[in-house]
Amino acid sequence: MRSLLLLIVILILGIKFYSIEFLATVLVISFLIFFHELGHFLAARSLGVKVEVFSIGFGKSLIEREFKGTNYRLSTLPLGGYVKLKGQDDMRPGFENLDKDSYSILSPLKKIYILFAGPFFNLILAFFLYIIIGNLGLNKLAPQIGNIAPNSAAQEIGLQKNDTILEINGIRIQTFDEISKHLSLDPLKILINREGKNLEFILTPKIGQGYNDFGQIVEKPQLGVSPNGTSTLVKHQGLESFKYAAQESFQASTLIIKGIVKLISGEVEAKNLGGIITMTEITSKAAQNSFTLLLFITALISINLGILNLLPIPMLDGGHILFNLYEMIFRRKVPQRTFEYLSYTGMAILLSLMLFATYNDISRIIGE
């Protein structure tokens, strides 16, 4: 009962200080982790492995029910969850159980199947969320010109404020963000709408400084225009929604992988690493803005969760997959002491990253 009261107090404080959007954040994160664990659960059950515990949240159990040999729980802290398979214990890396319904007796390939199912469910969930988003539509900046920079390519050919860019080299432009994706240093054919009339221009962009997706200053082709602030509802319906979902899933996955590489190489400063507070802030703002934007952020976080869990770090799914690949290739298991050492090292790395990300979040809040 005390645990239940603690959970209620946490939620009340969250709603009081962050409004109802805080509750939306808790639900989003809990749902994504639930879906991740559901992947492991279904994969394990499909191979006859006993799932001893399926918990939504961590900590003391608030509500639990036994069904077909599995203990289903709702635990105190809703930001997380886990499944406990018979014969697998992350806190005791060397633990094994040789019963016929145990994870321990499975072949490496079957273990990889179970391990990969969690991240895969996150990626599939994101794909279907993008399909829903495409059909509902998402408000984005319209490709309408606001300010025009002096001596820019746009000024030189006579583009004007409130012109709407319709096409670049025959490619339809729906949002302002799409403009930069189709620029090059070669002459471009640009179709615009000005006061109801379509006009065509030949323009060669100039090199200028701008920011990439990671906040780095880079040189790239520019028109020299900014948006006028008008928004437009962009929809991708029917079969087009599947193409949109595939593109968004691929772009988000690529962005995450590039971000990890840049973080490791030092191209992106470690202070940019955000944690649960940043995630809560972003999700809460999305919930305030619109339901579709909340779905978009949910899809992005789901892909993050899927990709990050595949990193080859012990204690993550990717680390366990790596151990099993080693066993498949070399026909022997990772030595027990090495396995335990790497597992505890992985645990320390993850804990350090969580603490560092939280420190960054708090420093950013204090700085504001």
UniProtKB/Swiss-Prot annotation:
One Gene Ontology MF term: metal ion binding
Membrane topology category: Multi-pass membrane protein
Pfam family, one: PDZ_6
Enzyme Commission number(s) of this protein: 3.4.24.-
Active-site feature positions: 37
SMART domains, per the entry: PDZ
Cofactor needs: Zn(2+)
Keywords: Cell inner membrane, Cell membrane, Hydrolase, Membrane, Metal-binding, Metalloprotease, Protease, Transmembrane, Transmembrane helix, Zinc
Keyword Signal applies: no
Every PDZ domain range: 126-197
Transmembrane intervals: 112-134, 291-313, 338-360
CDD domains assigned to the protein according to its UniProt record, in alphabetical order: cpPDZ_EcRseP-like, S2P-M50_PDZ_RseP-like
Localization terms from the record: Cell inner membrane
Gene Ontology process terms (BP): proteolysis
GO cellular component terms attached to this protein's record: plasma membrane
Binding site for Zn(2+): 36, 40
Family as reported in the entry's similarity comment: Belongs to the peptidase M50B family.
Record's protein name: Putative zinc metalloprotease Cj1068
Species assigned in the record: Campylobacter jejuni subsp. jejuni serotype O:2 (strain ATCC 700819 / NCTC 11168)
